From Swiss-Prot:
Cofactor note: Binds 1 NAD(+) per subunit.
Membrane-crossing segments per the record: none
Source organism of the structure: Cupriavidus necator (strain ATCC 17699 / DSM 428 / KCTC 22496 / NCIMB 10442 / H16 / Stanier 337)
An example Gene Ontology biological process: S-adenosylmethionine cycle
Residues in the signal sequence: none
Sites where the protein binds substrate: T61, D136, E196, K226, D230
Cellular compartments annotated: Cytoplasm
UniProt-recorded name of the protein: Adenosylhomocysteinase
Pfam families per record: AdoHcyase, AdoHcyase_NAD
GO MF entries: adenosylhomocysteinase activity
């Protein structure tokens, strides 16, 4: 990929001439994103994000373009990079760059370019710093915290344990050589972060528990209208889209192994079963395993499943769920892919020594010593974004409405003391608001409680209707 940067412009995209195409698709997406567009309309006049300078690290797709333009419509200044080397839609990036937003993203970035671009979202053209982060997976948040630690003690970036860390540590060392206080200066300016996904939320809670987190964070992922919709219904549609575009495989009759039965795993299993695959599930959590069994899925271990499966999908957010030994046991032509956030769910590093034959972008044949070949999709990264275009606009509207509300909440309350350093979730009434806005598109008719009914169950007539501990 020969990415293009115009020296007169503060962006780096694959081809700025794709902007017209991107703009047309953005216009279509807006009609499918009722919640996000309603929030844009509601708050545009008040400009609740005026003064906010948001460093965004999230998949640079058409749907994200609508989010970026919503943040700007509400008064924010924005700089953007993708949170995945394969997830950018180049026409979306071009449209956003052509509209005047600094964006650094193209499909097929190298890891060196990825960390360069993540640094660039913190380098404002006027020499200033951002004051907010909008993150997906936690890389932007990690970068500042780790870099600030390395300013004091470079031993924290001395020993890389993965290819990803090798490039991250090298990027931090290079930045420190040029500007020894760059990370702490940017870190001190951040007033809060909103985090999109399960993996990033895990990182935030770990940092908070260790006392390492330096600013307040809102966990957008655990808003009901995010995790129970984006993670479940989004994956239910985009997983098979990615597998089909990549391989044209017939799903029916195949044994499909779904590793993990959280919301992402549930949606993935539903999608594969809907196309008549025989779905097996692996799980560590007895509650999730029981849910899978009660839905009629066979619950097995990966050690057992490895030699039987035709299609393998990891959905755990964990490390080395599929190991080299598992892949060595798999059938010839088995399809292996991941719909969790990072590529280390599958031990890709252990098979890099073998012969790789690229069939087409993000589809590789990997030849094992015994002559067997596996089909590896998106090099173990997100299959739905690497091999297709990710979740549909409608379901992303829920997620991005929550992101926008969370950015407004943190920015408006930045000096109030409401959010000391820690990890928070949005209140139930805002979750319900997003759901109401989304329902308009579906021509749904909500039943209204009478005053007597509301009193009987002990809620307000206008909601919220469930306690915070309620499990949807």
């Amino acid at each position: 990929m020969n990415a293009v940067t115009d020296l007169k412009q503060d962006y780096l995209v694959a081809d700025i001439n794709l902007a017209g195409w991107g703009r047309k698709e953005i216009a279509i997406a807006e009609t499918e994103m009722p919640g996000l567009m309603a929030i844009r309309d509601e708050f545009a006049a008040a400009q609740p994000l005026k003064g906010a300078r948001i460093a965004g690290s999230l998949h640079m797709t058409i749907q994200t373009a609508v989010l970026i333009e919503t943040l700007k419509a509400l008064g924010a200044d924005v700089r953007w990079a993708s949170c995945n080397i394969f997830s950018t839609q180049d026409h979306a990036a071009a449209a956003i760059a052509a509209g005047g937003t600094p964006v650094f993203a193209f499909k097929g970035e190298s890891l060196k370019e990825y960390w360069d671009f993540t640094h660039r979202i913190f380098d404002w053209a006027d020499g200033g710093t951002p004051n907010m982060i909008l993150d997906d997976g936690g890389d932007a948040t990690l970068l500042l915290h780790l870099g600030a630690r390395a300013e004091k003690d470079q031993s924290v970036i001395a020993k890389a344990t993965s290819e990803e860390e090798t490039y991250l540590f090298a990027a931090i060392k290079e930045k420190l050589a040029k500007d020894p206080s760059w990370y702490s200066r940017n870190l001190a300016a951040i007033r809060g972060v909103t985090e999109e996904t399960t993996t990033g939320v895990h990182r935030l809670y770990q940092m908070a528990q260790k006392g390492e987190l330096r600013f307040p964070a809102i966990n957008v992922n655990d808003s009901v209208t995010k995790s129970k919709f984006d993670n479940l219904y989004g994956c239910r549609e985009s997983l098979v889209d990615g597998i089909k575009r990549a391989t044209d495989v017939m799903i029916a009759g195949k044994v499909a192994i779904v590793a993990g039965y959280g919301d992402v795993g549930k949606g993935s299993a539903q999608a594969l079963r809907a196309l008549s695959a025989q779905v097996w599930v692996t799980e560590i959590d007895p509650i999730c395993a029981l849910q899978a069994a009660m839905e009629g899925y066979r619950v097995v271990t990966m050690d057992y499943a490895a030699e039987h499966g035709d299609i393998f999908v990891t959905c755990t957010g964990n490390y080395h769920v599929i190991t080299h030994d598992h892949m060595a046991k798999m059938k010839d032509q088995a399809i292996v892919c991941n719909i969790g956030h990072f590529d280390n769910e599958i031990d890709i590093a252990s098979i890099e020594k073998y012969e790789w034959d690229e069939i087409k972008p993000q589809v590789d044949h990997v030849k094992f010593p015994d002559g067997k070949k596996l089909i590896i999709l998106a090099k173990g990264r997100l299959v739905n974004l690497g091999c297709a275009t990710g979740h549909p606009s409608y379901v992303m509207s829920s997620s991005f409405a929550n992101q926008t509300i969370a950015q407004i909440e943190l920015w408006q309350e930045r000096d109030s003391g409401k959010y000391p350093v820690g990890v928070y979730t949005l209140p139930k009434h805002l979750d319900e608001k997003v759901a109401r806005l989304q329902l308009r598109k579906l021509n749904a008719q909500l039943t209204e409680l009478t005053e007597q009914q509301a009193a009987y169950i002990g809620v307000k007539k206008e909601g919220p209707y469930k306690a915070d501990h309620y499990r949807y």
